[in-house]
Regions:
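One-carbon transfer enzymes
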Residues: 1-251
Length: 251
């Protein structure tokens, strides 16, 4: 039986480990990974390069979406570009995305921050079928977990990363063998709610107004203080005054 072809689109540690899992199980899953698209974002871990991993296993590097060949499957994990209808249709069987947030509650970007700002008690991660709208396609599999009290954004990221890798490893074999059911997100919108956020919104929620009450200030700091990124700040005159974790420890 001929192997099914897979195009992998991804970045960040979760993308690296999902790609590596597929590489290690190519024979068991009866697949061939025929190409990788990645911006090789190593912000979270400089040792995890998807492009280097692909080269080590003779996987072709593809520079742009319009250069993708047809494949049986497209698997997207934290890919940095939005796929258009014509891109998704390059998958003859199925195009899927691993979205590190619960759906339909949090589509788009900065989902960890907004969940903390919204005071959510539960978070999650989702594998869904891709369509032309952002994080909108039918749900294939999901995993949910409680958000700890006074959770910081990096803690929620770590919890979601672990849940996402487990979700992928537990479900990808069935997905590749067409053993799954689809659930439309619309069926959950009344119960769960829905929102979409964009990458540039993080700049607005990092700006702290010192006239806010203490709880709101603390919540914004917990939601936006991520090691390796610009910290939350307040403007005093024309100067940015940055907050740090020591503020939380001394309060």
């Amino acid at each position: 039986m001929s192997k099914q072809s897979v195009l992998f689109l991804g970045s960040k540690p979760i993308g690296y480990h999902c790609l590596n899992y597929l590489i290690q199980h190519q024979d068991a899953f009866n697949i061939e990974i025929i190409g990788l698209l990645s911006n090789d974002n190593t912000t979270f871990d400089s040792t995890l390069s998807l492009k280097k991993l692909a080269k080590e296993h003779n996987i072709i590097l593809i520079d742009a979406l319009n250069e993708m060949p047809e494949s049986d499957f497209i698997i997207s994990v934290q890919y940095h570009e939005i796929l258009k209808k014509q891109d998704i249709e390059k998958a003859k069987i199925l195009a899927i995305n691993l979205h590190m947030a619960p759906l339909p509650e949090y589509r788009g970007c900065n989902q960890f921050s907004f969940a903390i700002l919204d005071g959510k008690k539960e978070f999650g991660t989702t594998i869904h079928k891709m369509d032309a709208r952002i994080d909108h396609g039918d749900i294939i599999a999901e995993k949910r977990f409680p958000i700890p009290t006074n959770c910081w954004v990096n803690e929620l990221y770590d919890l979601t990363y672990s849940a996402s890798l487990s979700l992928f490893q537990e479900n990808i074999a069935n997905i590749l063998s067409n053993q799954f059911t689809l659930q439309t997100q619309k069926d959950f919108e009344n119960e769960r709610g829905t929102s979409i956020h964009f990458r540039n919104e993080i700049h607005d929620i990092k700006r702290i107004d010192l006239s806010w009450d203490k709880e709101k200030i603390e919540r914004h700091i917990r939601a936006t203080y991520m090691p390796g990124f610009e910290p939350p700040y307040a403007m005093i005159g024309n100067e940015k005054i940055y907050f740090s974790t020591t503020w939380n420890e001394k309060k």
